[in-house]
């Protein structure tokens, strides 16, 4: 039987009727049978024992199977293996993939149309985003242009130069005032009216600053939108307070209505507020509230008074050795506490304190007044006039008790001798 199996016809190599794995199994079986015969013959001669022959036979069979499996090759690479591909194989594989990818990119055109590549669809969301960014940039640019137009309309740069030239010794007060005006007048739409309060001792330039402001705004907006109200002149008697209330309320309402039509911001200056009756202060306070129509929010109110002047004088004299100009917050709180005792309307006001004037500022006041009246500016004469005033003396500094209030009267006494 074994001979018949060994003599079985083998198909020619040209035609493979059995798959490669089956042929490998057949060869293994033939090899095993051949080895069994040879091993048995050796054992029969007595050279080896039966157990050692079996062990050797199993070892040989396993080695033959391993070597035969390694040496067997397949006609096609159809099965997965753990062999690490070489660089040449990787390069070849990538070239094949590129070639296949290029083949798949060919576009088939119908015979009756013009050959052209399909148009890529652009994202509509991207277009909308670009449009939105463009609109925002345009609005920002337009807002900046409007701010510049408003500031130019009120000529605040010219106002600042005028104040710095004609108001002596109040550099910090002018800077704070201009900051508030520039911030508020940059636009026509606001959520509250601007309430400024000029406070300080007598003769330091509060009323003079108010007159310069009124003159400037009359020239840039119109005389109809600027109101100057002096308490001792317009409402001298407390018995007339009811009539004063009606007059003030009517003037404010009418002026605001006209200004809203022409898109202008009116300016109201109330001087000598320390003499104003409480009932009249209540009327003003009602216009400072936030819960009003829009036209009543686009207004500038300026309150000028001596309230807090004593506290400012005391603060300046106590801080002569220090740079009291570097303590604005402390001075602001001192003045505000004094104003709150007088009336609650100052809770919504921006405090602009005017401090004491030094002797060098008094000399400037005399020089300016002499030139204004046509006198020759003799330095010795100016020193003589300034020496007639009273001063607080602290260290090496002299602060005028009455400020520049008596300068005009002193210069007027010189006129009979010209």
Curated annotation (Swiss-Prot):
Q: Which domain of life is it from?
A: Eukaryota
Does the keyword field hold 4Fe-4S? no
> Which controlled-vocabulary keywords does the entry list?
ATP-binding, Membrane, Nucleotide-binding, Transmembrane, Transmembrane helix
Which residues span the membrane?
Answer: 128-144
* Location within or outside the cell: Membrane
Report membrane topology.
Answer: Single-pass membrane protein
**SUPFAM superfamilies referenced in this protein's UniProt entry, alphabetically:** P-loop containing nucleoside triphosphate hydrolases
Q: Name one GO molecular function term.
A: ATP hydrolysis activity
Query: One GO CC term of this entry?
Result: nuclear envelope
- Residue numbers binding ATP: 200-207
Record-linked Pfam families: TOR1A_C, Torsin
Similarity section: Belongs to the ClpA/ClpB family. Torsin subfamily.
Protein name, as recorded = Torsin-4A-B
- Organism of derivation: Xenopus laevis (African clawed frog)
Which gene holds the coding sequence for this protein?
A: tor4a-b
């Amino acid at each position: 039987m074994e001979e018949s199996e060994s003599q079985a016809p083998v198909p020619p190599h040209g035609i493979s009727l059995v798959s490669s794995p089956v042929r490998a199994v057949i060869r293994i079986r033939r090899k095993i049978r051949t080895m069994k015969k040879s091993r048995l013959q050796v054992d029969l001669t007595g050279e080896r024992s039966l157990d050692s022959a079996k062990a050797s036979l199993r070892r040989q069979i396993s080695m033959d199977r391993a070597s035969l499996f390694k040496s067997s090759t397949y006609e096609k690479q159809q099965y997965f293996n753990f062999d690490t591909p070489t660089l040449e194989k990787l390069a070849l594989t990538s070239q094949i993939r590129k070639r296949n990818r290029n083949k798949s990119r060919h576009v088939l055109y119908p015979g009756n149309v013009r050959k052209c590549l399909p148009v890529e669809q652009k994202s509509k969301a991207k277009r909308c985003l670009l449009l939105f960014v463009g609109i925002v940039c345009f609005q920002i640019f337009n807002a900046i242009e409007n701010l510049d137009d408003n500031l130019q309309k009120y000529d605040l740069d010219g106002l600042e130069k005028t104040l710095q030239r004609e108001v002596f010794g109040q550099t910090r007060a002018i800077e704070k005032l201009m900051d508030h005006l520039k911030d508020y007048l940059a636009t026509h739409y606001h959520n509250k009216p601007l309430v400024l309060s000029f406070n300080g001792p007598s003769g330091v330039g509060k009323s003079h600053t108010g007159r310069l402001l009124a003159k400037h705004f009359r020239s840039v907006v119109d005389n109809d939108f600027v109101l100057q109200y002096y308490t001792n002149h317009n409402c001298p008697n407390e018995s007339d307070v009811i009539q004063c209330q009606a007059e003030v309320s009517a003037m404010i309402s009418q002026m605001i209505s006209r200004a809203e039509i022409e898109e202008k911001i009116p300016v109201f200056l109330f001087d000598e507020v320390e003499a104003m009756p409480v009932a009249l202060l209540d009327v003003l306070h009602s216009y400072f509230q936030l819960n009003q129509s829009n036209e009543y929010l686009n207004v500038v109110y300026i309150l000028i008074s001596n309230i807090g002047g004593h506290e400012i004088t005391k603060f300046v004299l106590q801080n002569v050795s220090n740079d009291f100009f570097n303590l604005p917050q402390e001075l602001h709180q001192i003045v505000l506490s004094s104003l709150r005792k007088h009336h609650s309307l100052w809770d919504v006001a921006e405090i602009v304190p005017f401090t004491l004037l030094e002797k060098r500022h008094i000399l400037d006041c005399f020089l300016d007044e002499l030139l204004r009246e046509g006198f020759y500016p003799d330095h010795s004469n100016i020193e003589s006039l300034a020496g007639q005033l009273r001063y607080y003396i602290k260290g090496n500094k002299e602060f005028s008790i009455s400020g520049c209030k008596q300068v005009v009267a002193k210069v007027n006494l010189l006129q009979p001798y010209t």
